[in-house]
């Protein structure tokens, strides 16, 4: 039962990444090592973020929820956008190729670093626990989030982006950066359960994805 549970969690977490890699056409461009380079950039950015947070923001321990402090901590996630832009700027090719390489490499590195060990240790335990299923589903939400963020960074860095689209792209980028902070605050204030919080995050990410897709299509069509 424990091995079967681990297999289910592993498949739910990792197979969507493999399917995305195969179906997006990246395998035809031999982009595997480009994705690995994106993953290495992710590790460097996360190290810088950890050092910055540990230096300037003390850990919140109980008591009143520190909204200002948590907001400032969430602002550090801007570094992810800078890292994604760095990855895309080092890759030549079409926009969708750059977006998928950066997003898939970034999300895969996060998956390996933050969820691989918990799944291996926890999902193989004696007792069944839904939190590992939730963790696997959350990894798929993260993949969508990074694809959305990469598309937003690609659009905002276009030198020929129409000025009428720039405010909309900046707004979506702001929402992407502070989405985790807003969701965490909402869950804290409303005392939501784990499944409800996961559903809320999926809905918010889906809305951002649809909005970004509509804007991306508009930008591409204008410049085609």
From Swiss-Prot:
GO molecular function, one term: ribosome binding
InterPro entries in UniProt: TMEM147 (IPR019164)
Tissue: Expressed in T-cells, B-cells and monocytes.
Parts of the chain on the Lumenal side: 59-66, 125-129, 188-194
GO cellular component: endoplasmic reticulum membrane; multi-pass translocon complex; nuclear membrane; plasma membrane
Coiled coil ranges: none
Keywords linked to the UniProt accession: Cell membrane, Endoplasmic reticulum, Membrane, Nucleus, Transmembrane, Transmembrane helix
Pfam families: DUF2053 (PF09767)
Keyword Aminoacyl-tRNA synthetase among UniProt keywords: no
Membrane topology value: Multi-pass membrane protein
Cytoplasmic topological intervals: 22-34, 89-98, 156-164, 217-224
Localization: Endoplasmic reticulum membrane; Nucleus membrane; Cell membrane
Transmembrane segments annotated in the record for this chain: 1-21, 35-58, 67-88, 99-124, 130-155, 165-187, 195-216
Physiological role: Component of the multi-pass translocon (MPT) complex that mediates insertion of multi-pass membrane proteins into the lipid bilayer of membranes. The MPT complex takes over after the SEC61 complex: following membrane insertion of the first few transmembrane segments of proteins by the SEC61 complex, the MPT complex occludes the lateral gate of the SEC61 complex to promote insertion of subsequent transmembrane regions. Also acts as a negative regulator of CHRM3 function, most likely by interfering with its trafficking to the cell membrane. (Microbial infection) Involved in the immunomodulatory effects exerted by H.contortus GAL-1 on host peripheral blood mononuclear cells to down-regulate host immune response.
Family: Belongs to the TMEM147 family.
The protein's assembly and partners: Component of the back of Sec61 (BOS) complex, composed of NCLN/Nicalin, NOMO (NOMO1, NOMO2 or NOMO3) and TMEM147. The BOS complex is part of the multi-pass translocon (MPT) complex, composed of three subcomplexes, the GEL complex (composed of RAB5IF/OPTI and TMCO1), the BOS complex (composed of NCLN/Nicalin, NOMO and TMEM147) and the PAT complex (composed of WDR83OS/Asterix and CCDC47). The MPT complex associates with the SEC61 complex. Interacts with CHRM3, CHRM1 and AVPR2. Interacts with LBR; promoting LBR localization to the nucleus inner membrane. Interacts with DHCR7.
This protein's name: BOS complex subunit TMEM147
Organism: Capra hircus (Goat)
